[in-house]
A protein has these predicted regions:
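Cell-envelope and extracellular/periplasmic
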Residues: 24-175
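Catalytic His-Asp segment of secreted/periplasmic serine-dependent ester chemistry enzymes
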Residues: 1-23
Length: 175
C-alpha cells in the first residue's frame, strides 16, 4: 500500500483506534439532532460509536438502556416502542460525554428517494398554492438531504470529484 498523506492518516487513525480502543469518544450519525423524528410503535434501535469498553446509557420517556462499546467502538441499544408524541428528550451518555436531543418527535417516518421527481416542489404543482395554504401541521418535520452536486449532463470539476472521493454526497442539513 502506497497511500498519499491523507490515506496514511486514515490508516494511522484506524490502526490507533484498533490498538488503543480510542475512537474519539461518543459519536452519533448526523440524523441524531434536536427536532428529529423516531418511528412510532416499533422498537427503537439507537446506535453509535464510543471508545472500546465505554458504557453508553440511553434514555427517553422514562426508559433507560445501556450497552458497552465493542472492540471496534460500536454500541447499540434497543428501547421499547413509544407512542406518538412531539416533545421527547433523548439523552445519550458515555462517561463524562453527554448528548441531549430536545423536541424529539415520535411518529411516522417516511424515506423518499429519487432524482427529478424528488426535486419537484409543491408550489410547482397545478394545485400547489391551494395545497400549501391548507398545510397546517406544526409537527411536520423534514430532513432534506440535498445532493452536494447537480447531476445534470455537465462535466464535474476536480473539486466535485474530490468531495465524492471523500464520500461527501450530500450537503449538511438538520431537521
Amino acid at each position: 500500500i502506497h497511500p498519499n498523506a491523507e490515506g496514511a492518516g486514515i490508516l494511522a487513525k484506524t490502526v490507533y483506534g484498533g490498538i488503543t480502543g480510542n475512537y474519539g469518544g461518543l459519536q452519533l450519525s448526523g440524523l441524531y439532532t434536536d427536532d428529529m423524528v423516531l418511528q412510532r410503535n416499533v422498537p427503537l434501535d439507537i446506535h453509535g460509536i464510543a471508545n472500546t469498553g465505554d458504557q453508553v446509557t440511553v434514555s427517553i420517556a422514562g426508559q433507560k438502556a445501556s450497552a458497552v462499546a465493542n472492540n471496534r467502538g460500536e454500541w447499540s441499544v434497543v428501547l421499547q416502542p413509544l407512542p406518538v408524541g412531539t416533545d421527547y428528550t433523548l439523552t445519550i451518555q458515555a462517561g463524562k460525554q453527554k448528548k441531549e436531543f430536545r423536541h424529539v418527535a415520535v411518529g411516522e417516518v417516511w424515506l423518499c428517494s429519487g432524482q427529478s421527481n424528488m426535486a419537484f416542489r409543491l408550489n410547482q404543482a397545478a394545485t400547489g398554492k391551494k395545497d400549501i395554504a391548507q398545510a397546517d401541521d406544526p409537527d411536520f418535520r423534514l430532513f432534506d438531504m440535498k445532493g452536494r452536486w447537480e447531476t445534470y449532463d455537465v462535466a464535474w470539476p476536480a473539486s466535485c470529484l474530490d468531495s465524492l472521493d471523500h464520500l461527501q454526497y450530500f450537503q449538511p442539513t438538520t431537521w
